[in-house]
Amino acid sequence: MNNILSEEVLNVTDFTTSRQLTLWKREDLQSSQLDDVAEEVPVALVYNGISHVVMMASPKDLTHFAMGFSLSEGIIDSPREIYGMDVVPSCNGLEVQIDLSSRRFMGLKARRRALAGRTGCGVCGVEQLNDIGKPVQPLPFSQTFNLGNLDRALKHLNDFQPTGKLTGCTHAAAWVMPSGELAGGHEDVGRHVALDKLLGRRATEGEEWRQGAALVSSRASYEMVQKSAMCGVEILFAVSAATTLAVEVAERCNLTLVGFCKPGRATIYTHPQRLIAD
């Protein structure tokens, strides 16, 4: 198999489709024109030849997605437990074929579940409600962040949404350095998928990605908190609100959860001791 950081095999340079649409504007007649629509395709994650999950996603950065999903769902503990990946077309979408260590594959088969293919849906396929909000090892308090640097990150978050700028249809997730600069980011039609792409990228980057926080352009659901905590992220910033279950999970696993992030303001839901306010 190819190295896990190899380029996707598909020659995809444009992740939108032009369609003839009808527009309506007040006091104007309807007009027809071409406009961009974001691509959304079924993506199957196939471990050692067995399909584990199908998600609806944007068809880019899929090896990062597969790595992040594997980590945030507890399929692996380390990127070293994945030996290689290939992205290949299938009859109805795309497959990420993952070469998983034998030990991890045995564990995966023991708890295998099939998730229905909704856009970034995290509850689909969970067999019992008790499986939601599974226990996460409490995070250490090793990170701090100066809220005065958050404005810089918010200003540049859209830089990682080129498809979103064309279509208004994607979510973004970016890694914020302590200085407020963005080390990198990813977008997707599904907010959970965008976060998984970021978490997968972070797992394969160097030490400069150890310090900082995750920033998402969406609301913060319980699953986004849980995924972040599973990958050792101590601080999660969200542009929109957090749900009650997200707050409960964040409190329980020692994650600092911040919502309604706007220039000059934010709402701190849990564990404010990591944050510095100048």
Curated annotation (Swiss-Prot):
* Transmembrane in keyword set: no
Coarse class of the protein's main subcellular location: cytoplasm
Active-site residues are C121
Briefly state the protein's biological role. Required for formate dehydrogenase (FDH) activity. Acts as a sulfur carrier protein that transfers sulfur from IscS to the molybdenum cofactor prior to its insertion into FDH.
Q: Name one GO biological process term.
A: Mo-molybdopterin cofactor biosynthetic process
The keyword Magnesium belongs to this UniProt entry's keyword annotation: no
Checking Pfam families in the record gives: FdhD-NarQ
Q: Which InterPro entries match?
A: Cytidine_deaminase-like (IPR016193), FdhD (IPR003786)
Q: Which residues bind Mo-bis(molybdopterin guanine dinucleotide)?
A: F260, C261, K262, P263, G264, R265
A cellular-component GO term for this protein: cytoplasm
Compartments where found: Cytoplasm
The organism is Salmonella heidelberg (strain SL476)
Highest rank taxon of the organism? Bacteria
Task: Report the protein name in the record.
Answer: Sulfur carrier protein FdhD
